[in-house]
Amino acid sequence: MVSLRDNIESQPLSHNRRVRKNFGHINLVADIPNLIEIQKNSYERNFLQLNIKDSERKNKGLQSILNSIFPISDSSNIANLEFVKYEFDTPKYDVDECSQRSLSYAAPLKVTLRLSIWDIDEDTGTREIKGIKEQEVYMGDIPLMTKNGTFIINGTERVVVSQMHRSPGVFFYHDEGKVHSSGKLLYSARVIPYRGSWLDFEFDAKDVIYFRIDRKRKLYATTLLRAIGMNTEEIMKFYYNSVTYKCIKNKGWSVKFIPQHITAHRLTSDLVDADTGNVLLKAGQKITPRLAQKYFSIGLNNILVTHETLIGKYLSEDLRDPESDEILAKIGEMITADMLQVINDLKIKNVNVLVINPQSGPYIRNTLFADKNQDRETALCDIFRVLRPGEPANIEAAESLFYNLFFDAERYDLSEVGRIKMNSRLELNISEEITVLTIDDIKNIVRILVELKDGKGIIDDIDHLGNRRVRSVGELIENQFRIGLVRIEKSVIERMSAGDVDTVMPHDLVNSKILVSVVKEFFSTSQLSQFMDQTNPLSEITHKRRLSALGPGGLSRDRAGFEVRDVHPTHYGRICPIETPEGQNIGLINSMATYARINKHGFIESPYRRVKDGYVTDEVVYLSAIEEGKYKIGQANSKVDQDGKLQGEFINCRVEGGNFVMVEPYEVDFIDVTPMQVVSVAASLIPFLENDDANRALMGSNMQRQAVPLIKTEAPFVGTGVEGVVAKDSGASVLALHDGIVERVDSNRIVIRTLEQKVDGSPSVDIYNLLKFQKSNHNTCINQKPLVKVGHYVKKNDIIADGPSTDNGEIALGRNVLVAFLPWNGYNFEDSILISERIVKEDVFTSIHIEEFEVIARDTRLGPEEITRDIPNVSEEALRHLDEVGIIYVGAEVKAGDILVGKVTPKSESPITPEEKLLRAIFGEKAFDVKDSSLHVPSGVSGTVVEVRIFSRRGVEKDQRAIAIEKQQIEKLAKDRDDELEIIEHFVFSWLEKLLVGHVIISGPKQITAGQTITTEMLKGLSKGQLWQLIVEDANVMNEIEQIKIHYDEKKHALDKRFATKVEKLQSGDDLPQGALKVVKVFIATKHKLQPGDKMAGRHGNKGVISRIVPEEDMPFLEDGTVVDIVLNPLGLPSRMNIGQILETHLGWASINLAKKISTLVKEYKDNNIDIEQIKKFLLELYGKDINYILEGSEEGIISFCNKVSKGVYFATPVFDGAKVQDVKDMLKLADQDLSGQVKLIDGRTGEYFDRLVTVGHKYLLKLHHLVDNKIHSRSIGPYSLVTQQPLGGKSHFGGQRFGEMECWALQAYGAAYTLQEMLTVKSDDVNGRIKTYDSIVRGENNFESGIPESFNVMIKEFRSLCLNVKLEVTASK
């Protein structure tokens, strides 16, 4: 067999990646996990379990729901519907087809169900199987996830955002003294299930414990304890210890000495040892727990107390008469002086009392005695009355309701997470499979609540990430599925009971529409299913990694307090403390940290390196917030020697509660993997983040997501090293699926012959069709450009084509421009930005925006609408861009008002006279009246038509334009097929040639004689078909040729079949909405150059609006004549405290000057003035050992590398581990620049130097999608409001500028009476006045008469609505 990897001499593409000088000191041992893994894992792996055999599927996601809902039985148990397995069919359309046709990308779900019919003997009740029917039932189309972690719903890309919610389990907290006026802490506990009723326990101000179910009326907690089967004695024994007082004649009572029950106080009586009679402490002396422990350790076991000590104690069992066994006092009753007298009189020797003291309060006992319910039945009925007021309470109904509330798995579910949390908090060991409440749970919740009241233990922190978990896509959709399947269950039971079960098949019972509508509703309307932010690749990634506390089952932004929104110590390495929206959602919508991942229970985990005996290992362990609390964790920048031993006497470590302690190296358990793990992806792209104020960093990370993809992309000179990861994981770039050799490349596609050998040894072919000028969700342009050349060898996952906002496989949101910090004629007042004309001229910040316009031809009551060029009352000039069908040509330049698609609609006719009817009957039908309803370019839009799509209903004949577009698409498919076949044929026939050469022919084509030995020249003279006719003597060779032929034919057949299927899809009509005959979509691309009013920003939260574009000759320039591109205000820095931008500017200045130095060295080398060693030495000084592989290569390779950095040297300064001020100075020194980073600038207008040195450097700036073209418009005449008759407001309504109250004051202050009158009348709501004014303008006169404004009439009507009749009386002036 031929090896596909023979003769690969080309350099692998991975060496073509951009090299950055990295300032990071910390050695990375863990790679950044795939940034969209959270979406894909949750949906595909955990919910759908795609591509997993039925037998190997775990009981989770879809499998677990189907298992829990089925089997379904009818009421009489005759029919039983069981679930066997499920599988997905292939989706009808692929992702691209769904986007173009406005369809949802989904796969049909087929569930195999088994219907068993039983025969029940009426006399004996025995059941026998009567029949079994198994059938595959269609359950609807289930949306599939694209490879980029998104869903396509009705043609638009959507993202399902993960939700943060409170974890199921039990939580204890108090009211912080806010409820009671005294400031007393009222403790409470809440059991939150995943599904089911909430259970609350709470103390009131009198220290009685209550409980509530679903926030209904409260009841005594002991009512619930009785309802779960506990009696008074069991309650007392569970919650209290008991101590026995023994009577010692004439001395008092002896009781066991327990030092734990002693608190510091002064004794009211002597402390006497009951066994020896010794007085240990006199009355009035102080005893402390420490002293008590000392006495206990030297043998004090029992102490003597007086008779009066028993008064006020509570009995721990019933007090009985020793002779008659009569109950004198019940358990829990207080011992009074009278009762003590009875005890003495009856000579009762032992009295058992409850241990109630300051460490163990009488709360349960008091609640028990306040509660009127004495048995389980009355307690259950009491609960029933609260939950079902008005219904008669009987014990059966009450018992059933109580059981269903908390103990029925169908109605109550704590979930596995809830059970784990419950076990951990209550110190229980109940199986994780039991996800309902147990009696032990309820008993222990009350126990812990009482202990908290007694001052033992601490309350839970609800903002701790151990108590908040993430519900990702899979889980959110799983919940919707459950709702749908529960509805299906009800309908199945109804259908089973209604019809004749014997003749029914499983598909007759299941109505899939119920499930489809629930899933569709979730994807279309849920708050968590969002229109994807597709401004640029970073905004896509951030959207997929977003965590929202809002949404169903979450918080509401109006009621969320400061604590929920605040940064919590457990966010470290899990949730970014920087990236969150400004405004009312601050802190409620967060972003996952770069290295964070979500575990199977939904808790966020962060990676740490394990430390053993003071040595840092390379073992990476992911810990959740709960686990992290058990360890001491050092920082990533802790000093470590070459062997990994932690340096220093003490190491700064984080411990539980977010506190920092200094510990010895051997006590450290883990250290951080990298300082970058703290922040999110967007924040990790900000160089010198550590030098910026957090508020500005927040703005910086948010504004990067608003950067518009530019025509010319350029990666930042000063980056952080994460740019490549973001570009790769975003899906904007094209990655190679397999190792291979590039066979063909053009701007539209890349063809790669893979090196993955198939079973038959033939290569497969990967064809990558690139996206060209496609519209994104936010009207930005998606365009992919190839990076590879023919003959390149590419490795799997190498980037072979750049997408929007990427440059050589790195994210590139803006451009590097030369910036000076300098005030310039007030044009950079208040953060305004002054730009050079060069930026506009050379399209530095020019972007393409694509808008989509759609027209639908419908079948109306009066007849069908028609797309045509024949439009009434339209000049030929207006139709110049339309083809013969009436649709605009691709490439046409259009402006506002131009016709894009000509369309006419039938008009209703006026009634016709009998004479006209007769004439029509004789001379034939006259053409119907039609009106023009063409699609025009809206105001404010102009550009080039880049694409036209035509969709026709099935059965409707296609027009010429649709046929031409279809033909073009078929040719494209045929080219893909032919290229793939050609590569396979080349391989197959070269293999065939190798097999045949040197063998003796037995028979063959006519021109070949038997007995000849085959040579290469002989084979060249034969056609491909004739090669298969050759038969040689060697039987083994013939067998191998036979196999090759079979595989070749199969492959060719498969390619033809795939081509035919795609063509059939193209040629069959489209599924259009009801009544639509044809849909035409026109895409217009507009080039937006930078202009005054556009918003720009840096990466450090420094934003501003362009105030003026200055000619190059007027801009400040350097001594070498280089003109500054942008002038910024130096006053924008000190108060904002984002010093990172200055460091970036300095390093950018070093970058550009180092590049100049390298270019000079290369020029000198080419002129033979220096040898390559000097270049090597300089590169080694600059980059260090990172580029040894280049320096050890060929001279051409070194010069090629130097040419790549001729515009600027690329730096990486990782977040919190980047370049320090000294590093920046070192680079400036290496570039032969002043260490201040400042230079002399010359004023372009005067030619004179500025008075002071100016900070100049290359800085990375972004153009944001707040473009002035989309904000400012002008109105001459336009629509008016119906009621007030005033012009509308806003661009979308083509409205005017509001002249409000304060503006009127301004005119009054200037005494501009006529202008004011004009503003308030004819330019606003004086209807008659404005008509007269218009007439006078048309006639060329300049006088106008103002009347009564409509707002006056509105005011009069307002008075009338208040029953005040106001009349306007006009009196003639004298």
From Swiss-Prot:
Q: Cross-referenced CDD domains, in alphabetical order? A: RNA_pol_B_RPB2 (cd00653)
Which is an annotated Pfam family here?
RNA_pol_Rpb2_1
Q: What is its EC number?
A: 2.7.7.6
- Listed InterPro entries: DNA-dir_RNA_pol_bsu_ext_1_sf, DNA-dir_RNA_pol_bsu_external_1, DNA-dir_RNA_pol_su2, DNA-dir_RNAP_su2_dom, DNA-dir_RNAP_su2_hyb_sf, RNA_pol_bsu_bac, RNA_pol_bsu_CS, RNA_pol_bsu_protrusion
A Gene Ontology cellular component where this protein is annotated is: DNA-directed RNA polymerase complex
Which reactions are catalysed by this chain?
A: RNA(n) + a ribonucleoside 5'-triphosphate = RNA(n+1) + diphosphate
Single GO MF descriptor: ribonucleoside binding
Its BP terms in the Gene Ontology are:
DNA-templated transcription
- Give the first-level EC class, as a single word: transferase
Q: Which UniProt keywords apply?
A: DNA-directed RNA polymerase, Nucleotidyltransferase, Transcription, Transferase
Q: List the disulfide bonds.
A: none
The family annotation for this protein states: Belongs to the RNA polymerase beta chain family.
**Summary of the function given for this chain in its UniProt record:** DNA-dependent RNA polymerase catalyzes the transcription of DNA into RNA using the four ribonucleoside triphosphates as substrates.
UniProt cross-references to NCBIfam families, sorted A to Z: PRK00405.1, rpoB
Question: Assembly and partners?
Answer: The RNAP catalytic core consists of 2 alpha, 1 beta, 1 beta' and 1 omega subunit. When a sigma factor is associated with the core the holoenzyme is formed, which can initiate transcription.
The name this protein carries in UniProt is: DNA-directed RNA polymerase subunit beta
The organism encoding this protein is Rickettsia typhi (strain ATCC VR-144 / Wilmington)
